[in-house]
Structure formats: C-alpha cells, structure tokens
C-alpha cells in the first residue's frame, strides 16, 4: 500500500498559490520582458522596501497583470500610473486591473491611463 505523501492529483487538486496573474495570456516578447522585470523587482527589491502598498492587489501585482493582459506599452503605463497613485496623498483600497480597456484609450495618448481601473470602467 503506497503513501500519497500529501500530494493531491486530479480535478480536485488545489492550484499552487501565486501572487501574480495566473490566467492564460499571450506570451509575446514585450509581455515576457515586462513581466520578467516586475518579477525581478518582486524577488529582489520588494523585500528590502517592505510591505508598504496601499492597494490590493499590490502595485507590482497590478503591473504584472496589466502587462500580461494588455501588453507592455499599455500595461506598463497602467502600472506606472498606479505606482504614482500609491503615494501618501493618492488612492487606496481594492483596485483591480480592468479585463478590457475602453476604445478611447489610444496608444499615442498614454496620459489617459492615469485613472484606468476596473472600478472605474465597470469591467
């Protein structure tokens, strides 16, 4: 009689925990580069800075998901503006990445990504 060793198999097996976006996404070179930079930050510098983010998901988790969902250009701007909003006089609370972006968010107008969040777009 064999021992299962505490490992689950089959459909009822729990997914391993990941702090980052785990849904399937297109693995383009830009997205891979951007998410690798975010992951490098999470592994190295994030532990030195400490848990100081005022949002959920954290700013690095938000940037990772934004880049994975919307690409390096759009997701990078969304992540940048999220970090800017995280300051002492900025926003706080639950602020997820929108599943879809509004058609009026053009690539050549990155300042419009300033207030881009799922709570504002309703998606």
UniProtKB/Swiss-Prot annotation:
Keywords linked to the UniProt accession: Cell inner membrane, Cell membrane, Membrane
Pfam families: YidD (PF01809)
Keyword check for Cell membrane: yes
SMART domains assigned to the protein according to its UniProt record, in alphabetical order: Haemolytic (SM01234)
Membrane topology according to the record: Peripheral membrane protein
Localisation per UniProt entry: Cell inner membrane
Membrane listed as a keyword: yes
Any single Gene Ontology cellular-component annotation: plasma membrane
Annotated region (Disordered), positions in chain: 1-23
InterPro entries linked to this entry: Membr_insert_effic_factor_YidD (IPR002696)
Residues of the signal peptide: none
Cross-referenced NCBIfam families: membrane protein insertion efficiency factor YidD
Family in the record: Belongs to the UPF0161 family.
Function: Could be involved in insertion of integral membrane proteins into the membrane.
UniProt xrefs under HAMAP family: UPF0161_YidD (MF_00386)
Name by which UniProt lists this protein: Putative membrane protein insertion efficiency factor
Origin species: Brucella ovis (strain ATCC 25840 / 63/290 / NCTC 10512)
């Amino acid at each position: 009689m064999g021992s299962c060793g505490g490992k689950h198999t089959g459909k009822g097996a729990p997914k391993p925990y990941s702090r980052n976006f785990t849904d399937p996404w297109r693995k383009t070179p830009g997205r891979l580069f951007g998410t690798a930079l975010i992951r490098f930050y999470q592994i190295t510098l994030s532990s030195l800075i400490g848990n100081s983010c005022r949002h959920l998901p954290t700013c690095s988790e938000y940037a990772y998901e934004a880049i994975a969902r919307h690409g390096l250009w759009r997701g990078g701007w969304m992540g940048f503006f999220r970090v800017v909003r995280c300051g002492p006089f900025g926003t706080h609370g639950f602020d997820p990445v929108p599943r879809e972006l509004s058609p009026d968010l053009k690539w050549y107008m990155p300042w419009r990504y300033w207030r881009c969040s799922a709570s504002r777009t309703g998606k």
